[in-house]
């Protein structure tokens, strides 16, 4: 009987009956998760591949801080980059956060850096991070939708990037 009621409710939503079908979900907003400064070693050129010119940049450390978490970027990881025929650079960074309470979280952050077209201003670099956190205090990271920004600090004294991550609410 429970299954019949659930199917009837689902049918009403699909066919437009009931309040659930008429109410649109609220637009998502963004909440700051953290801002990080990630330090880097010089790029290592791999060379031409069938997909484009490949390089990687070792991640050597850094820090992150936000309202719910803070800690360090562990000195292991890399930023794989691929220059493609359209002039863009595809990036996939794979690295680890270590929170101030000792939890290690994997981050795989991907995006694209593309040159401006037709005299337009440069497009801001946006990334799509995915987290893999152990069960416990930070497991909520495994189930969210996130967007990041990638930039540079002109005052930096060593090679680094500034990555700010937001959670969709």
Predicted ranges, named:
Residues 8-9, 19:
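Cleavable N-terminal signal peptides
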Residues 21-169:
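Beta-strand-enriched cores of mature, soluble protein domains
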Residues 1-7:
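Bacterial N-terminal signal peptides that target proteins for export
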